[in-house]
């Protein structure tokens, strides 16, 4: 009789498990709130970001077991992360950073996974314009410096001149690469505990 009791409990537990493993339906609004919360919690930024705009997703299926995508824009607020204030209390910074974000929800995974990718608005175009302006400014500056140092360098050997040119190129290359490293898109992936 005891064996039958435990077998019954085991069958009930196995039958009840799939229902508890399925994710709870997530509306589009809840998915956006969760994405903003994940970004603020994992991005390592000093300021909190708030939803500025969301692209409507009419094909969003709250009970989907597959992957779903959402697109939205975040803007930097005046609140700091360590203040732990509600986002509704935080106003946007006048010159705050604006981020274009794409979120991917993978509900077929156990537990569900969200991956966010955020890029500063106008990042590539502005970066190219800044590089061109910097190159022009550096070229003008180099010409002025060359004119001033022209008399001094006449006395220097060719080897010293070559080293100076080489190190200028290295310095420019390092600056350029550092700018690219720090302007890469932020990608965050987390599991969602339901």
Swiss-Prot record:
GO biological process: defense response to bacterium; defense response to fungus; killing of cells of another organism
Annotated stretches, region: Disordered: 125-156
One Pfam family in the UniProt entry: Cathelicidins
Family: Belongs to the cathelicidin family.
UniProt function note: Potent antimicrobial peptide against Gram-negative (P.aeruginosa, K.pneumoniae, E.coli, A.baumannii). Shows moderate activities against Gram-positive bacteria (E.faecalis, S.aureus, S.pyogenes). Also shows antifungal activity against standard and clinical isolates of yeasts (MIC=10-40 uM) and dermatophytes (MIC=1-5 uM). Adopts an amphipathic alpha helical conformation, that may allow to partition into the target membrane. Shows high toxicity towards human fibroblasts (micromolar ranges). Shows low hemolytic activities on human erythrocytes.
Biased composition (Acidic residues): 125-145
Location, primary (coarse class): secreted
GO cellular-component term (any): extracellular space
Propeptide residues per the UniProt entry: 23-164
Subcellular location: Secreted; Target cell membrane
Tissue distribution: Expressed by the venom gland.
Signal peptide: 1-22
Keyword Acyltransferase: no
The UniProt record lists the keyword Disulfide bond: yes
UniProt KW keywords: Antibiotic, Antimicrobial, Cleavage on pair of basic residues, Disulfide bond, Fungicide, Membrane, Pharmaceutical, Secreted, Signal, Target cell membrane, Target membrane
Name of protein: Crotalicidin
